[in-house]
Amino acid sequence: MLSVEGVSFRYAGGEEPVLRELSISVPAGGIFGLLGPNGAGKTTLISILAGQLRAASGRVTVDGTPLEELRRREPASLGLVPQEFAFYPMLSCAENLRFFGSVQGVGGARLRERVAAVAAFARIESMLARRAGELSGGLRRRLNLAIGLLTEPRILLLDEPTVGVDPQSRSFLLDSIRALAGEGRTLLYTSHYMEEIEAICDRVAIIDAGRVLRDGALDELLRDEAAAVPVRHNNRSLEALFMHLTNRSLRD
């Protein structure tokens, strides 16, 4: 269980906090979705969980162990697939994978094995000799995913992993993420695309302005709101629920 309790954060010079005593509980295994518009605080929370930012207050634990302690003790246990492209465009795909693997403590024969394994999983084997900067948007997203999997993390943070890709690449990435959950990993998935959240997530937290508006199993959320949100469970139901809670669209 990944537990986020009362986490708040404000950027230096910012007038308003980005996260406001935000709490979620992510069960082990499966895919937990964070759904919210741009600026809701999704990326900030991911950055805190990844150790890139420090929360002003609150605590984060994994099975009762403080996240900072877990990162020190088991740095390979948590992986990150950021929204930005996390590689060097002038290096080849293979060079990027070897570099980031070594930075994360993977070396020797295991590094060679992991590079081959993640390249095969992301289906970029034929691209390993090409410079990362020459790849299409969809292939860059696949390389991003491959880098995040190098350490075989049991918890994977995915921040808008399908942004800017064509429908075919999006379908491949979503299928790949489902496969990872099938291997028993715990995935935290952020998006402002409600159709993606509905397609792959077991549980959902709808957030806005740094606060959790609703949190629960997808079917439970829709059933509980059925009286207030007169829509069927289709690809617009989560957006309708969000609009009911905030009086605005996810795309605002």
Model-inferred region functions:
Residues 98, 102, 109-127:
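Conserved ABC ATPase "signature" region
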Residues 215-216:
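ABC ATPase "signature
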Residues 50:
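Helix-to-loop junction immediately C-terminal to a conserved catalytic motif
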Residues 58-69, 73-74:
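Conserved ABC transporter NBD signature motif
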Residues 131-138:
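Conserved ABC ATPase signature
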Residues 156-160:
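Catalytic Walker B motif of ABC-type/P-loop ATPase nucleotide-binding domains
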